[in-house]
């Protein structure tokens, strides 16, 4: 005996003004009696503050009361019997009904401290002497088309320069003073380019970079995507920045004065439109990280390359993500 949910869309993406449609599939070897089949839709913003992202006072809050977005239960079938074999029961529920005073439908997002999740649950109640049947499935919510920008936005580009003088952390001596080459000391490095500062969630982060000069050979250049989650706690704000994704742009030393394209696909469930709500906010950053060849770096292969280190040079820029039609 089993129960399963099958939604009408394989990608499980729905908009608040649309109906969530699908089938409840029940398989049983013999007919069973039940006291009703109920479908429950739930959506909420779940927040927590971990010890590493807040001080002692903030960490006392722990898990914060969720912000409810959607909570609705409907009876799909009254009490009765389910015949043996496979039974399919269709359902259709509009997510946002007219006249309802609901919280804003934020887009689905799974972060470190903030999670925006929508679930559909079905229960087949069978009384005290029999085990009830139940199953839950997550569906994804995206903004209504009426709330989106009318046309795709061209990606806004920002120009960046990465040199030894733009770094706020300590660097290896050879990166600053250079190396000795035929009795001449060649020093420093300079990388310039441009990258998206605003882009659509349906498109990539794009841009280009050029290594103009580098006294020390380059090991790799990575494009890193970060999320910045902020939660309001009383009069304070707890903020945590965490790495979402790393995309390698180059591997090995790079030819100088050669234009290298930047093209990064955004992960669906780990990103959402840049959001500024009252109790929380979700922002994003993009970093260009240059790793230079160094014996010291070989001893720290397992460390997070997003953290400033002696053999790394980086530039971090804000990134606004938007949903377009």
Describe the role of every protein-language-model region.
Residues 1-325:
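C-terminal beta-sandwich interaction modules and adjacent acidic
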